[in-house]
Amino acid sequence: MTIKRLDHTVLVVEDLEAAVAFFSALGMTVEGEGQLSGDWIDRVNGMDGVRVHIVLLRTPDGNGRLELTRFQSPELVAQTPSPAPPNALGLRSVMFEVDGLGAALDAVQRRGGVLMGDVAQYEDQYRLCYVRGPGGAIVALAEDIRQDRSS
């Protein structure tokens, strides 16, 4: 048995419309949307009465997917502390490679993203930053600045 691929990542959000706008600003497109409920989703989540509204987004290259989920029932539960700091245990961030870091950062900031530190350069390879995005998620943006991008 081996993993075939990473199918998608899920981000639970309070404001689904704002989250879709945030990630759409980075070029992601809506692949699907729906309301989910029933015995199967209760069993998968280990909770009763689960009702969610989801939007599935796809990256421009077609290889990555992000599921934005808004729980309608049971109620959302805030992380403590909220938002979680970068050194909190668990899933830390999602990183996207972008063309034009400045433009990508401007686009997400216009949609509520907050730059967490500074834009920094890692050697001669990447310019990158962390942005606090929808639901307090850490969204990393990285621009490949290598002259020879075959590495």
PLM segments and residue spans:
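Hydrophobic pocket-lining residues within nucleotide cofactor-binding pockets
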Residues: 6, 16, 101
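Vicinal oxygen chelate
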Residues: 2, 33-35, 53-56, 64-69, ...
